[in-house]
């Protein structure tokens, strides 16, 4: 088995057929699709059952509700592919994507993480394309800094060598789980390649955590960014490092405005937060 596609599902009755159809239409004999029902109450996964006879590579795993991270981890435990990738149940994958990516991986066999383009907010007025350069990176840290990896820590526009997850799992109970997970994978110094082939269609979700994040959620995001800065040895005084730290400072200002908490222990941060609040 070459590739396992993991799709967590929780109450996605309106979008699952479209999502699953976009993936199943690309199936080959050396691929499998693992649908993880995370305790849905709307009968979402029953929509997939008619496809079981047509697609023997489709498997359905049912479990009690544990959240997105727990569902992804359940899929990882079942995965048999040399590589794994993820799809959110309200998104889609453009035709021909997996064939192009697996062809590239067959020619670049030492690749551990392959990142591919995303149509961000697909179908919304804010739709825009994220398209990384086609290149092999000298190190995971170089990839992180030069592509500003903190701006696209998406789990689903990447194909991973499965054994990277032997020691890294998604954090159960956390929001912004990708910001916790991707830097931990990169800290294992995998061989990273980016490509302009393939396309993930990331649909705008007005109920998503990134749209309506409260103070506690933003605290978790900032904590994940702080962990990433440590893992990736991101120094404030370097050009690319400063951009990441600027992003962290902006997040700290949001956290202070909503909660009054200061998590960053930098000189003058408290003064900056106070002035920012007074000037609003």
Protein language model features and the residues they cover:
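C-terminal subregions of glycosyltransferases and related glycan-biosynthesis enzymes
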Residues: 154, 203-280
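Nucleotide-sugar donor-binding/catalytic module of glycosyltransferases
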Residues: 1-220
């Amino acid at each position: 088995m070459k590739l396992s596609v993991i799709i967590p599902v929780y109450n996605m009755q309106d979008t699952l057929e479209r999502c699953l159809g976009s993936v199943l239409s690309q199936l080959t004999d050396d691929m499998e699709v693992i649908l993880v029902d995370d305790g849905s109450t709307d009968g979402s996964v029953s929509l997939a059952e008619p496809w079981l006879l047509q697609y023997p590579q489709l498997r359905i795993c049912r479990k009690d509700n544990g959240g997105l991270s727990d569902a992804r981890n359940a899929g990882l435990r079942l995965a048999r592919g040399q590589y794994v990738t993820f799809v959110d149940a309200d998104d889609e994958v453009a035709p021909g994507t997996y064939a192009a990516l697996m062809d590239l991986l067959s020619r670049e066999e030492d690749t551990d993480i392959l990142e591919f383009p995303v149509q961000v907010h697909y179908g919304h007025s804010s739709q825009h394309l994220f398209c990384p350069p086609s290149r092999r990176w000298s190190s995971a840290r170089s990839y992180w800094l030069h592509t500003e990896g903190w701006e696209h820590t998406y789990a689903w526009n990447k194909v991973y060598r499965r054994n990277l997850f032997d020691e890294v799992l998604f954090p159960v109970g956390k929001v912004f789980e990708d910001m916790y997970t991707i830097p931990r994978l990169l800290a294992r110094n995998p061989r990273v390649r980016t490509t302009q082939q393939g396309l993930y269609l990331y649909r705008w979700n007005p109920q998503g955590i990134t749209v309506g994040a409260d103070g506690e959620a933003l605290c978790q995001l900032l904590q994940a960014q702080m962990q990433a800065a440590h893992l990736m040895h991101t120094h404030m005084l370097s050009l690319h490092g400063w951009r990441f730290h600027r992003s962290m400072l902006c997040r700290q200002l949001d956290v202070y405005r909503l909660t009054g908490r200061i998590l960053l222990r930098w000189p003058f941060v408290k003064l900056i937060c106070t002035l920012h609040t007074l000037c609003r």
